[in-house]
């Protein structure tokens, strides 16, 4: 049917008074628990409780996996609901801002920023040190580093930014160290460096930072760290209060170790505290010695996992992590190959390690799209002599039942008070492990 239409719209009677001509928007999880979107309301009939949206959601309305599943959403930018301190309404047509201050403006100042550019941007710089600085109250990113080398952002405070804290792309030997990054619109740190084809390390790091209260504007990307490229490190960070997971990574030979992560996955489902996925060639990454606790596991869908090797991610090592309560699963191995899950401690979880075989249902080897894992591997020249030597099992993937989760090693893990230590999906055979 028409995905722009909702029936039996459950809402307060005050919605009957909303002036949709001013522009009313609804933000929520319209279909899946891992995809939120803001959609404009077009019309609303208070008699039938029928609402029509101005645009279609990418996945439609209603979860096809759960019949009659209730979808969560809320209204934003509603002039008639401006009724408590801290709220505001922007009348774009008349260029007027209505704002109810949360307190005494003489004691607590309010800032309005018009700066859409990064507060500091460096391109091609080297031996640059940013130390003991405060970056705050911008509409965009706080710091952007492009193709820089040997730079350090150290002991800085980044807060109240519209987008992200520190974004570093390209170059090598760049480091974000002992900073506090909080109350930003998207992620705290985005770091991409290194060459996957040549497996040259970026040698960049995110170390010893406090990253919290993130994703105020963009829930889906509101993590502590997004890491990409080859040969970078995320260590000794304290990450908490994120709408989605704590760290996501892609690429090769990254080291994610000795981090403490708690109170993340606050609003998202089917999410990982440490997350990667959908790439056979994303190999050689190590997630070790992290302490993961007090995570939110929202009901419905796939919930949250401490380490999520999603959509046939392969060739990673998960070792020596402590996972204490909160998450639905300690490790979700989603159909991947040649992963090692060893020596982890899982305490008080519904499921310790969960393995499924989604490959036959999802992977394609001859059609375009993100599920063509052979094409993704070919992009990094996975059959080159260098890659054959580094990842010999990957070089043989097409010869060894490529769609099945084979070659994984699960050993020496400890489960305390877990309802189901090992959860194997019905289509997984024990001899594959």
Q: Residues of each region from the PLM?
A:
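Glycine- and acidic/polar-rich repeat regions and solenoidal domains
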Residues: 140-145, 159-169, 182-433
